[in-house]
């Protein structure tokens, strides 16, 4: 029964994260156009920032239970961030001759995601 409860916790978080990613993609396409996958980039950067913050905060805090941490990280952040979409969009750009955009997409997604995990960790240390 415990494993089923944990699966439901992750599933609910995944639903919320994936829904948020969808809304971010709609917002990005409307506001930034469709020439570059800004929605995926924003979702990945936001997810990196939040997971860095949550993981750092939860190390020394009793405020986040193990179930809440699972809900937030594996669930919401797992549904929000998307390596498969990033990979597909990058390959599509590269195979369609958009080498510059494809390389920019790789650099921005990987570089910003790594950077924002560190920023999230530092924010958690500063705030808590």
Swiss-Prot record:
Membrane topology of the entry: Multi-pass membrane protein
Pfam families named in the record: CRCB
GO molecular function terms attached to this record: fluoride channel activity; metal ion binding
Main localization (coarse): membrane
GO terms, biological process: cellular detoxification of fluoride
Function of the molecule: Fluoride-specific ion channel. Important for reducing fluoride concentration in the cell, thus reducing its toxicity.
Protein family according to the UniProt entry: Belongs to the fluoride channel Fluc/FEX (TC 1.A.43) family.
Name recorded for this polypeptide: Fluoride-specific ion channel FluC
Organism per entry: Clostridium perfringens (strain 13 / Type A)
Gene field: fluC
């Amino acid at each position: 029964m415990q494993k089923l409860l944990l699966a439901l916790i992750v599933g609910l978080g995944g639903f919320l994260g994936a829904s948020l990613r969808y809304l971010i993609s709609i917002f990005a396409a409307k506001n930034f156009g469709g020439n570059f996958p800004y929605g995926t980039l924003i979702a990945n950067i936001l997810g990196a920032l939040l997971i860095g913050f949550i993981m750092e905060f939860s190390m020394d805090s009793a405020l986040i239970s193990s179930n809440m941490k699972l809900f937030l990280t594996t669930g919401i952040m797992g549904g929000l961030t998307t390596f498969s979409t990033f990979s597909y969009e990058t390959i599509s750009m590269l195979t369609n001759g958009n080498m510059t955009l494809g390389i920019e997409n790789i650099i921005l997604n990987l570089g910003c995601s790594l950077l924002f995990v560190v920023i999230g960790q530092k924010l958690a240390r500063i705030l808590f």
